[in-house]
């Protein structure tokens, strides 16, 4: 049986809220003004299409954390 290791590199908004203390509107503001799509966050549809605007938004916690460190 293969060993599965949980990796928290990518998380949905709720996970990011728990890790950072940011609210939904704060996350949206960062997403629209500061973060780069494909680097800090990405949208993935349930069908696996990465270019869908209707997909679930996944956030890259290590990249966002580095963004804050560098600011």
Swiss-Prot record:
GO terms for molecular function: sequence-specific double-stranded DNA binding. Gene3D superfamilies: Putative excisionased domain DUF1233. GO terms for biological process: provirus excision. Pfam families: DUF1233 (PF06806). This is Uncharacterized protein YdaQ. It comes from Escherichia coli (strain K12). The gene is ydaQ.
